[in-house]
Regions:
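Structured beta-strand/loop patches that form or line metal/cofactor-binding pockets in enzymes
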Residues: 23, 28, 37-48, 316-326
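Domain-scale recognition of functional cores that engage charged ligands
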Residues: 55-57, 68-328
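Amphipathic, alpha-helical segments enriched in basic
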Residues: 29-31, 38, 47, 168-171, ...
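Amphipathic alpha-helical regulatory segments at dimerization interfaces
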Residues: 7-8, 40, 255
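Low-complexity, highly charged intrinsically disordered N-terminal segments
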Residues: 1-36, 61-62
Length: 328
């Protein structure tokens, strides 16, 4: 999916494809970020760690978004080990996450895990991860570190919207562009946009996605990725409506009943409000006035911080076993 999205963005930016996909994905970003993600030095680079946010619903799993700068690698590794030691059959075994994470850096002699102040709550997890894999090879550094050596591999644990506050960002990306070091995730803000799901569901791009993904995988993603729309305030022709919604103007979202508001508004990306549970509004859980205010923010914020609208699939309840330490 990321390979296909990378191709669509590149073709659009280079004029080999309609301009609107890259225009959407570049919306609200400074020219420095746009230049960086279009740089030929990072042309084919993709994130090497991807965490899908998966909801288990009555109709099967749904992937609500993808995170290419995720926390939780160390936590998942610890859980894998704990459950394996307790006798559970864990996908990947006790060391699957550790082995997988170590494997993305190839044979680099030094692996630098660079954590920004904004992401500092995850630093203990990164330090644990480095210590479990190889403390002589893996090291954790703050946002001021810039002593990169030729051949180093870097895991970027800071957000692109925060670059102005990360002194190491400029020398890091310059060294990566010169091929003196490698870095993941690459500085491609468009791959961190939730609106990629809206591009996937856009009928104008269906054939392009099919060519890039193949019929089978396209059908798989159609079942997994919830229907998504970009809140673009550009007016529609009088006879047109947003597919799957029957609305002709985003203002009409305000008049939907609470049942009809089984929809989520989210900030698409490139914002300090675009991660965690921030920047998310579930229409069916909000009173009409709060939902209307969120709709207004989405419409008015398109140029600076685009929002997406996504069909909400309610998670299902499942039975789970647990261990009672008092009863044994």
């Amino acid at each position: 999916f990321y390979q296909a999205a990378n191709t669509i963005y590149r073709w659009s930016a280079e004029g080999r494809f309609p301009a609107w996909p890259s225009a959407w994905l570049d919306r609200g970003k400074p020219q420095s970020i746009i230049d960086l993600q279009r740089s030929k030095e990072f042309r084919a680079e993709l994130p090497r760690v991807i965490r899908p946010d998966i909801l288990l619903t009555a109709d099967g799993p749904r992937i609500t978004e993808l995170d290419s700068v995720p926390g939780g690698i160390g936590l998942t590794a610890w859980l894998n080990r704990a459950y394996t030691e307790a006798g559970a059959e864990v996908l990947g075994g006790a060391t699957g996450m550790l082995d997988g994470f170590a494997g993305i850096f190839g044979d680099a002699a030094n692996v630098r895990l660079v954590v920004s102040d904004e992401s500092a709550t995850y630093r203990p997890e990164m330090e644990w991860l480095a210590g479990q894999i190889d403390p002589g090879r893996f090291s954790v550094h703050g946002q001021d570190f810039a002593d990169f050596g030729d051949g180093d591999a870097v895991y970027r644990f800071f957000e692109l919207f925060d670059l102005a506050n990360v002194p190491t960002a400029e020398p890091l990306f310059a060294a990566a562009a010169d091929k003196r070091i490698s870095v993941t995730a690459p500085p491609k803000a468009f791959l961190e946009e939730k609106m990629l799901f809206a591009l996937f569901h856009n009928r104008n791009l269906t054939e392009t996605w099919r060519q890039q993904l193949g019929d089978s995988f396209q059908r798989t993603l159609e079942a997994l990725l919830p229907q998504t729309w970009v809140i673009d305030p550009a007016p529609l022709p009088p006879h047109a409506a947003f597919p799957g919604l029957g609305l002709t103007d985003w203002q009409q979202l305000k008049s939907l009943s609470q049942k009809e508001r089984n929809l989520i508004l989210k900030i698409s990306g490139y914002s300090e409000q675009a991660w965690g549970a921030r920047g998310v509004w579930l229409g069916s859980d909000l009173p009409r006035d709060e939902w209307s205010a969120a709709v207004d923010q989405a419409i008015e914020g398109f140029d600076e911080s685009p929002r997406i609208l996504q069909r909400y699939h309610r998670p299902t309840r499942v039975d789970a076993e647990w261990f009672d330490f008092e009863l044994g």
